[in-house]
């Protein structure tokens, strides 16, 4: 299921750095994580949905690249984000 605008705004408000922040790596990773979790739930029910699985893999790769960028840019922000999202890195 697609991410609703209300849920996206909640995520942005939770992870934003400044008042008009919508594109920081933290916000992007948080939104991608929510989408990945929703798609994982979908794929548990619809195991043969290979088109959605490919989209999931693309999202995971994009999130991985953003996390690598953030880790290289500011390790403290990276660690804080990982703890907030509950990612196992």
From Swiss-Prot:
Q: Name one GO biological process term.
A: translation
Going by the UniProt record, its keywords in alphabetical order are: Ribonucleoprotein, Ribosomal protein, RNA-binding, rRNA-binding
Q: Does the keyword Ribosomal protein apply?
A: yes
Q: Name one GO molecular function term.
A: rRNA binding
Q: Which domain of life is it from?
A: Bacteria
Q: One GO cellular component from the entry?
A: cytosolic small ribosomal subunit
Q: Which family does it belong to?
A: Belongs to the universal ribosomal protein uS15 family.
**How does this protein assemble?**
Part of the 30S ribosomal subunit. Forms a bridge to the 50S subunit in the 70S ribosome, contacting the 23S rRNA.
Q: What does this protein do?
A: One of the primary rRNA binding proteins, it binds directly to 16S rRNA where it helps nucleate assembly of the platform of the 30S subunit by binding and bridging several RNA helices of the 16S rRNA.
Q: What protein name does the entry list?
A: Small ribosomal subunit protein uS15
Q: Which organism is it from?
A: Anoxybacillus flavithermus (strain DSM 21510 / WK1)
Q: Which gene encodes it?
A: rpsO
